[in-house]
A protein has these predicted regions:
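N-terminal beta-propeller domains
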Residues: 2-169, 178-185, 189-202, 222, ...
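Surface loop/turn motifs at the tips and blade-to-blade linkers of beta-strand repeat domains
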Residues: 126-133, 169-174, 205-211, 246-253, ...
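Surface-exposed loop/edge segments in extracytoplasmic proteins
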Residues: 167-169, 204, 242, 337-340, ...
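Exposed aromatic-hydrophobic patches
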Residues: 294, 340, 410-413, 497-507
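Conserved blade-ending motifs and adjacent loop-strand segments that build the rim/top face
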Residues: 340-352, 383-416
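Blade-level signature of beta-propeller repeat domains, shared across WD40, Kelch, NHL, RCC1
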Residues: 406-445
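Extracellular/virion structural assembly segments
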Residues: 540-638
Length: 638
């Protein structure tokens, strides 16, 4: 067939411009290559070589981030953290508009993240006494001699506790249903009335009326007590029957649950079993004279969410513990409550709130890896949810009773004027935070480190920063997307981590995400000493299968010869193929690149191309020269 001139194009172009890959079906002509169904003969010469190379995977970019940092570094993909004060709840340790990844983490237990740049163990809580009571209560105060103290109500018993010991106050009568205080004066309510007393003195009865589900609280220099669906105001001089109700809810099944106050109002939360609300009561009338007057409902919970405890703090914030979890509200200038979303949602909800410094603590049930304890909320640290952008406050799990899973926290208070907490657990016990003894162990888990992309990554190294000499130890392990935990290294004693990289030999191969877990253990000989973690860093590389760049020169003339020296073509043949090729390149879609003689087919996109005609046009004006295609593979396999 040598020397035969073929005057028609013997191929079919499949899918040009239709979004398909395009494939050339071989005919009698012996071509070398085809791209998108257009066949070509090789134009390889010394000056026009065929080349293959790896495609770059790191783009050159201008860094206009406000702060210098990891995004400015070349080579490694880096993620690091040097403070943990943003609290728990982050899913991905990835940058966003407010860069929460810099200071938040996924979860923790038994550790204190609230000092910037320093993660330590929390103090231990010990059981002072056990209880079989479903509603144990505690209330902290400073006694008349200046000693940090708290009252413990356990059934029909009322007991004063100090660090040195305890003193029984009441040991008979009906079970105490509600406990409050005003300074060193206690108040409690039970089914046969309301009682008060100073420190450890025997109680005096304020009212002898029978009470149903009573709640008592000393607020705004008043004694507020509820019974069934009614609200009453008492004074220390009003011994006897209950006075007329200040307010009675129209629903006879309504029950009041908790009382607190704000700068200008008293708030009482209650529910009918399905609907739960916070009612506002004014404490002065229009003339500025003292009064207690119902002014309306200031907050209504979503259907099915029942308030258990409300707690006002520093005249601005109001904690709302419900059967669904915990919310933080704010009191506006009119005394109305604006509450936010649920910060966290333990399985059994929350009960009991106390505030100190910039924090609130709220009780939970079996939310500390099966044990019962407290959550801490940082009122001075607002964050926004990564997905919904809802405003939230930083939080984390806090102190807990080790091995305590009998019931939920029913009450929490401060131990006098100290920074130590005391909490009561239904059917369990009364727990007091220790002054110096630390928990034996605790951990922190980072969010999922995925570098803001679903592309696979190769996680190669991590490093940690901690003091040169550790009191105790820190063990680091990796958490994988398959749910596994891989132990890496433990630092202890005088072993300093410095900034040395630790290789992560596992997990093997590309991963979508990776996380670290830091387990802190206190000193073996001194329970008041424990390790500190100051920061961490992870190094990774892109794990995508590398693309190839192919540079392929082909002939583009009106009349050509194939590999078998068979002539083919016609006038305008080069122009026609060039225009077809340019249409494919402009479309930018993936195409099939065929190396016909080797029977290889590769999916590619056209990255670039150049047509070069070294000589002047033929007499007929037709073009002819070398077309150099720069192709990038798109569907490589391992």
């Amino acid at each position: 067939m040598a020397g035969t001139l073929v005057n028609h194009i013997p191929w079919q172009l499949s899918g040009i411009g239709s979004g398909t890959l395009g494939q050339y079906n071989p005919t009698d002509l012996d071509y070398d290559y085809a791209i998108g169904g257009i066949p070509f003969v090789s134009g390889i010469k010394d000056e026009n070589p065929y080349t293959e190379r790896m495609a770059p995977i790191r783009k050159e970019q201008f860094d206009n981030f406000a702060e210098p940092g990891e995004q400015s570094l070349d080579g490694w993909w880096l993620r690091s953290q040097s403070t943990f004060t943003g609290g728990a709840g982050v899913l991905y340790q990835d940058p966003d508009n407010d860069n929460q990844f810099n200071y938040r983490f996924a979860d923790s237990l038994g550790v204190d993240p609230w000092e910037a740049g320093n993660l330590t163990l929390l103090r231990r809580s010990i059981e002072v006494t056990s209880t079989t009571n479903p509603l144990p209560l505690v209330r902290g105060y400073v006694d008349p001699t200046g000693v940090d103290s708290y009252w413990r109500a356990d059934g029909n018993n009322l007991v004063k506790h100090t660090q040195a010991g305890s003193t029984s106050i009441v040991a008979a009568g009906a079970s105490i249903a509600s406990l409050s205080s005003s300074g060193a004066r206690y108040l409690f309510a039970r089914s046969d009335g309301v009682f008060f007393g100073l420190d450890t003195a025997a109680p005096t009865q304020l009212t002898n009326s029978a009470l149903t589900s009573p709640v008592v609280e000393a607020v705004k220099d008043r004694i507020i007590v509820t019974s069934a669906n009614s609200v009453y105001q008492l004074t220390y001089a009003s011994v006897g029957a209950l006075p007329a109700a200040v307010y009675t809810h129209q629903d006879p099944s309504w029950r009041w649950r908790s009382i607190t106050d704000g700068p200008t109002s008293i708030y009482i939360a209650g529910d009918s079993g399905t609907t739960s609300q916070i009612h506002k009561f004014a404490v002065v009338d229009e003339a500025g004279l003292p009064v207690l007057r119902w002014t309306g409902v200031t907050a209504t919970m979503p259907a099915g969410e029942i308030i258990r405890t409300i707690y006002s703090y520093i005249g601005t914030f109001i904690g709302i513990a419900t059967n669904k979890g915990f919310r933080v509200g704010e009191i506006d200038g009119n005394g109305d409550i604006l509450y936010g979303p649920l910060l966290f949602e333990p399985t059994f909800g929350c009960t009991g709130i106390v505030g100190n410094d910039r924090f609130m603590w709220v009780g939970s049930q079996e939310a500390h890896d099966g044990d019962t304890g407290l959550f801490r909320v940082d009122l001075g640290n607002q964050t926004q949810e990564q997905t919904t952008r809802a405003v939230r406050y930083a939080y984390a799990r806090d102190i807990y009773g080790e091995g305590e899973f009998s019931g939920g926290v029913t009450s929490v208070t401060m131990f006098g004027a100290s920074d130590r907490k005391v909490f009561a657990v239904a059917f369990g016990g009364f727990y007091r935070e220790q002054a110096t003894e630390l928990l034996p162990t605790g951990y922190l888990k980072t969010g999922r480190i995925r570098f803001n992309t679903e592309e696979p990554k190769l996680y190669k190294f991590f490093s940690v920063r901690m003091p040169n000499a550790l009191d105790g130890s820190i063990a680091i392990s990796g958490l994988t997307e398959g749910g596994g935990e891989i132990p890496y290294i433990t630092y202890s004693g005088a072993a300093s981590s410095g900034t040395k990289d630790v290789a992560t030999s596992q997990p093997v191969g590309p991963q979508n995400w990776f996380a670290l877990k830091f387990t802190l253990e206190r000193d073996d000989s001194d329970s008041s000493l424990g390790p500190s973690l100051n920061g961490w860093q992870v190094k990774a590389l892109p794990g995508s299968i590398r693309q190839r760049i192919l540079t392929v020169p082909v002939l583009l003339f009106d009349n050509e010869k194939d590999r078998a020296y068979q002539s083919y073509g016609y006038e305008g043949f080069a122009r026609e193929r060039l225009e077809q090729f340019k249409a494919l390149a402009r479309a930018g879609d993936s195409l099939l690149f065929q190396e016909i003689n080797d029977n290889l087919v590769t999916e590619v996109i056209i990255d670039d191309w150049e047509f070069r005609q070294d000589g002047p046009p033929a007499p007929a004006g037709s073009l002819g020269g070398i077309l150099t295609m720069v192709l990038r593979t798109t569907a490589e396999s391992t």
